């Protein structure tokens, strides 16, 4: 499945599973669909009191019911429900704004300065792009060019 088709699928999935997730009291943080021999639909949820294994099981049951009816994915896949974890994925401008000052790993769709992988500190967000301090230099990244972003946990 190409990137554009994948993007459309993720938008469709978000539309049909947001209500069941929020109905159980959780925030839908993001969705990843990884297509391979063993395709995976990964749904990240969060809650102010944390996410437990039982939370994930409850959400999995509700989401499975909706997916069985809507049937938006045409290939076999495994459903995973997960908390964002220490290396929390960032999906929206709001997520980046929430973690200003934190270290982030970025994977870009299209290279900038012949580079697709970047790491730095999130400095600001304007809705369309983010500014990340990379080696004491500010770099601007369009949100639309970010394929994947994760916080870098500190230990």
UniProtKB/Swiss-Prot annotation:
It comes from the Bacteria. Pfam families: DUF150_C, RimP_N. It is found in: Cytoplasm. GO terms for biological process: ribosomal small subunit assembly; translation. Keywords: Cytoplasm, Ribosome biogenesis. One of its GO terms (cellular component) is cytosol. Required for maturation of 30S ribosomal subunits. The keyword rRNA-binding does not apply. Its main location: cytoplasm. This is Ribosome maturation factor RimP. SUPFAM superfamilies: YhbC-like, C-terminal domain, YhbC-like, N-terminal domain. HAMAP family: RimP. Belongs to the RimP family. The keyword Cytoplasm applies.
């Amino acid at each position: 499945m190409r990137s554009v088709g994948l993007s459309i699928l993720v938008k469709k999935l978000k539309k049909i599973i947001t209500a069941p997730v929020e109905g159980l009291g959780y925030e839908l943080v993001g969705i990843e669909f990884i297509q391979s021999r063993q395709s995976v639909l990964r749904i990240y949820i969060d809650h102010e009191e944390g996410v437990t294994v039982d939370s994930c099981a409850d959400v999995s049951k509700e989401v499975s019911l909706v997916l069985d009816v809507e049937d938006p994915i045409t290939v076999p896949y495994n459903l995973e429900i997960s908390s964002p974890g220490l290396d929390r994925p960032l999906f929206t401008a709001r997520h980046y704004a929430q973690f200003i000052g934190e270290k982030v790993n970025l994977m870009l769709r299209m290279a900038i300065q012949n580079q697709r992988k970047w790491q730095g500190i999130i400095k600001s967000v304007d809705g369309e792009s983010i500014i990340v301090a990379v080696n004491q230099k500010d770099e601007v990244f369009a949100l639309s060019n970010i394929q994947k972003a994760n916080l870098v946990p500190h230990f």
